[in-house]
Amino acid sequence: TQLYGDRMLIANATGCSSIYGGNLPSTPYTTDANGRGPAWANSLFEDNAEFGLGFRLTVDQHRQRVMRLLSEFADKLPAELNAALHTEASPEARRQQVAELRQALTGVEGAEELLTDADALVEKSVWLIGGDGWAYGLDHVLSLTENVNILVLDTQCYSNTGGQASKATPLGAVTKFGEHGKRKARKDLGVSMMMYGHVYVAQISLGAQLNQTVKAIQEAEAYPGPSLIIAYSPCEEHGYDLALSHDQMRQLTATGFWPLYRFDPRRADEGKLPLALDSRPPSDALAETLLNEQRFRRLNAQQPEVAEQLWKDAAADLQKRYDFLAQLAGKAEKPATE
């Protein structure tokens, strides 16, 4: 919201983020000195992707209607202003142009509708926000080419309903109704969506690398198509002191549990590989880092041999996934020549 809040539309899936985002009378959202701030709405748990897509389609249709109205009054406007309104401009420059438009058409007969809706000419930033429980089945929206930004707050479980397993739950984690530990690897949503080829995809962790987080958000918003940001999100269901969450996030990235990357299809147009891998190969011991969290310690206390084997399997899986990302990014080790 600090980057785009004055022109931001948020479709928020039901879950933890909708509780702290819309639980009146308090709200984390505010307005700036000009009275502009995010427009927020909450959808049902399952359909937030379609709900947010509707935002984008509505904004685009609204803008097209205003552009048609603008063409009807082209002869009433200075030629330079009319040309500027038909070319790309920053939000700040566009707002200035809209102010000039209103000044030029004030008092002109029949221009009332255009004057009322002229703010539609300022590009809106549409964001679909929700947890992994909702978001790991949203490719029906990403398969399209609409300009929506999707932020997945990935807690690796259904946090708002007590911590049940989701497709994002990692191998070996104990969850509610899953006391024997997850026995298969989590779905790799990011890599799956890269395969479309037209989707901007980033995996971020605020505590692991702040600059990469901000850069990914800026690139996603600037990308003229669908974008997906998967953000590691600490949760009380993980079972550790969240005051230490940034330290844990750094360790999880160092072990390869949460690699950082940005997949930007525009890079291919520049003759570059689309994927930029922003974290190093796994180095820290995985088991030691996982033992910081109760969701992994519980299985170790109940079935230590099973836990040890699952952690070995998890480490091998994470290394394999990192190696695959490294190949996509052109960072794979070259075989020695004979």
Language model feature labels by segment:
Residues 1-150, 157-158, 163-172, 179-184, ...:
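Cofactor-binding active-site loop characterized by glycine-rich and histidine/acidic residues
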